[in-house]
Amino acid sequence: MTDLTPREIVSELDRFIIGQKEAKRAVAVALRNRWRRKQLADDLRDEVYPKNILMIGPTGVGKTEISRRLARLAKAPFLKVEATKFTEVGYVGRDVDSIIRDLVDAAIVETRARMREDVKARAAKAAEDRVIEAVAGRDAREQTREMFRGKLKRGELDNTVIEIDVADTSNPMQMLDPTGQGQMGMMNLGEIFGKAFGGRTQRRKMTVAESHDILMNEEADKLLDDEVVKAAALEAVQQNGIVFIDEIDKVCARSDMRGADVSREGVQRDLLPLIEGTTVSTKYGPVKTDHILFIASGAFHIAKPSDLLPELQGRLPIRVELRALTEEDFVRILSETDNALTLQYKALMQTEKVGITFTEDGIAALASIAAEVNRSVENIGARRLYTVMERVFEELSFHAPDRSGEEVTVDAAYVEKNLGELARSSDLSRYVL
């Protein structure tokens, strides 16, 4: 779990997301409150519940990107889901309880990976011994083994093909688990029968380099106690878990269309106990959702936040509004962020030995066209930049292998040449941009 201060969290988000200060501050405070709660005495800690957040803003302004970056910062079990994937209990489809099951699955993987790091040195030694045994033979003398150990450390054996016994991870009884049904916490048939077939190994041929990760993971898992991993993961989910529910507006029944879709309000009703605090059965044991932080987001361009069930609105007390992006924001997105599209295209073209230079007026022209098309066609926010950039680089991307060694300057004239006509014709831009 992260111990970053709110200022540090916002600063980290600023590297990838332009603007949206209010939303960044809200998630930063929510994340810091997880840490603050951990410092409290046990009796008071149980009484402090997370303040769930509702992010409202048009498409392409950074709602999903905030969640993606938050997941990396949180160092806590994190899951992002789309509300549209779920149906009311009783209908065909996934029910909302599977959110918690997926969160637990993610936590198990994350916890196991973290614990593997703790036993990495011992696992590396055991994996090394297995490789040497495969290369030199089981009955090799100590002197021979040490010679091969030296070669292994110098990388001289990386391309040597060896035959080793590795765990067979396939579960022949997987077909007994209908989607979502095998995790109901009652009788997981695939799990029961899978254990009967467990412990099997299969002999595989691979190079020494390929065997490294497989053997490291196997040896690390032998040193780990599954029950300890499970207990740590469940504790992390219950105390620090974060669930980001995207497209929450798509399960709103609009006020002028009451009764049009039974499943929509049903999904909201099913979310109520989950967000308020309930116990969900998973194949690893029961999970209490009382202290899981829920962040919901939606564009709300058709439905309104008030179209959500009043009870659900009450369970999302903190509301932040994200503003639409302007042309100036687009310029900053293309030039200031750590993952800017300009940097990505430079790196992609560099693989073909084609140098790319973006001038200030070139970036301004790209931003101007994206903003203009958003105004005249449909405002899809920063996602419009993907389309504009792809059209500008379409010709160059196709011919790049034949232009190796060239230097290309993307200025206003270059953008106009590749995109000007399309941007000026509203009929063309409606379909192409």
Curated annotation (Swiss-Prot):
The gene is hslU. Keywords: ATP-binding, Chaperone, Cytoplasm, Nucleotide-binding. A double ring-shaped homohexamer of HslV is capped on each side by a ring-shaped HslU homohexamer. The assembly of the HslU/HslV complex is dependent on binding of ATP. Pfam families: AAA, AAA_2. ATP binds at residues 18, 60-65, 246, 311, 383. InterPro entries: AAA+_ATPase, ATP-dep_Clp_protease_ClpX, ATPase_AAA_core, Clp_ATPase_C, HslU, P-loop_NTPase. One of its GO terms (molecular function) is proteasome-activating activity. NCBIfam families: hslU, PRK05201.1. Signal peptide: none annotated. ATPase subunit of a proteasome-like degradation complex; this subunit has chaperone activity. The binding of ATP and its subsequent hydrolysis by HslU are essential for unfolding of protein substrates subsequently hydrolyzed by HslV. HslU recognizes the N-terminal part of its protein substrates and unfolds these before they are guided to HslV for hydrolysis. One of its GO terms (cellular component) is HslUV protease complex. Its main location: cytoplasm. Belongs to the ClpX chaperone family. HslU subfamily. One of its GO terms (biological process) is proteolysis involved in protein catabolic process. This is ATP-dependent protease ATPase subunit HslU. It is found in: Cytoplasm.
